[in-house]
UniProtKB/Swiss-Prot annotation:
GO MF annotation, one: methenyltetrahydrofolate cyclohydrolase activity
Function: Catalyzes the oxidation of 5,10-methylenetetrahydrofolate to 5,10-methenyltetrahydrofolate and then the hydrolysis of 5,10-methenyltetrahydrofolate to 10-formyltetrahydrofolate.
Species lineage: Bacteria, Bacillati, Bacillota, Clostridia, Eubacteriales
Protein name: Bifunctional protein FolD
Reactions the enzyme catalyzes: (6R)-5,10-methylene-5,6,7,8-tetrahydrofolate + NADP(+) = (6R)-5,10-methenyltetrahydrofolate + NADPH; (6R)-5,10-methenyltetrahydrofolate + H2O = (6R)-10-formyltetrahydrofolate + H(+)
Highest taxon listed in the record's lineage: Bacteria
EC number(s) per entry: 1.5.1.5, 3.5.4.9
Annotated GO biological process: L-histidine biosynthetic process; methionine biosynthetic process; purine nucleotide biosynthetic process; tetrahydrofolate interconversion
Pathway(s) the chain acts in: One-carbon metabolism; tetrahydrofolate interconversion
Keywords: Amino-acid biosynthesis, Histidine biosynthesis, Hydrolase, Methionine biosynthesis, Multifunctional enzyme, NADP, One-carbon metabolism, Oxidoreductase, Purine biosynthesis
Length: 282
């Protein structure tokens, strides 16, 4: 019988710890605060922003939103970032991606103060992960994948893991993180030939393609553990993942649902990183 790996349970456990840590910060009159930088008015970004603000409010974390024009000059962006870096009451900074094409991603990411980077965007924080150091801040989505596997006692040691994503947001950092946990990793992407033949041999498949219900039962074996990172909208306007959940849910070992899967843990880990930043700077 297929086990459903609910992210909500993982998120709840993390929040229990965060509530205790927030109480200790309150005793010191410290209120964690997140600055959100959004360029343009994409509906997905606005929806994500609302979700973050709502989650922060529940934990009494303050937020400051900087709504920027999509054509903002790089020098103006960097001036704003410098101001936010110097604001003592701001503990975390999150910049929504992808960036407008005229902005240099490396320059933007490097402008975030290391101690206020809550999603491992700064190259130096990413470098630590590629060196096998997982003690610092980690990117929220890859960390959510790891936390779900840990919560459900899925040991990564010796496992064959296929990651269908090669971005610096998910695929590449996650590959380094599972390597540090002694797994064997294969990264696949849009140019991979005969993807089902590769995923079917894997113990764990992590997918972050961004294509609604693209992946069917022929991609898996009866013991496959599936972590579906993507949040898509299907033909009926309902949220779904890359995997056709109804098609595979009785034919694999375990699977995360969408919604109530990776996304809820990702947001909770962002809150955790904000609290940790406030603790460090207190």
């Amino acid at each position: 019988m297929t086990k459903i790996l609910y992210g909500n349970e993982v998120a709840l456990k993390i929040k229990e710890d965060l509530n205790l840590r927030m109480d200790k910060l309150k005793e010191k009159n410290i209120i964690p605060k997140l600055a959100i930088l959004r360029m343009g008015n994409k509906q997905d970004d606005i929806a994500y922003e609302r979700s973050i603000i709502k989650s922060c409010e529940k934990l009494n974390i303050e937020t400051k939103v900087e709504e920027l024009n999509e054509d903002i000059l790089e020098e103006d962006f960097l001036k704003l970032m410098e101001n936010l870096n110097n604001e003592k009451d701001i503990h975390g900074i999150l910049v929504f991606r992808p960036y407008p094409k005229h902005l240099n991603e490396n320059i933007i990411n490097s402008s975030i103060a290391l101690n206020k980077d809550v999603d491992c965007m700064h190259p130096l924080n990413l470098e630590r992960i590629f060196e096998g150091d997982l003690d610092g801040v980690m990117p929220c989505t890859p960390e959510a994948v790891i936390e779900i596997l840990k919560y459900y006692d899925i040991d990564l040691k010796g496992k064959n893991i296929v990651i269908i994503n090669r971005s610096m947001v998910v695929g590449k950092p996650l590959s380094m993180m599972v390597l540090s946990n002694n797994a064997t990793v294969t990264i696949c992407h849009s140019k991979t030939i005969d993807l089902p033949s590769i995923t079917k041999k894997a113990d764990i498949v992590v997918t972050a393609i961004g294509k609604a219900k693209l992946i069917k039962e022929e991609y898996f074996n009866e013991n496959s553990i599936i972590i579906d990172v993507s949040i898509n909208v299907d033909e009926n306007g309902k949220l779904c993942g890359d995997v056709d959940f109804e098609n595979v849910k009785e034919k694999v070992g375990a699977i995360t649902p969408v919604p109530k899967g990776v996304g809820s843990v990702t947001t909770t880990l962002l809150l955790k990183h904000i609290v940790e930043a406030a603790e460090r700077n207190s």
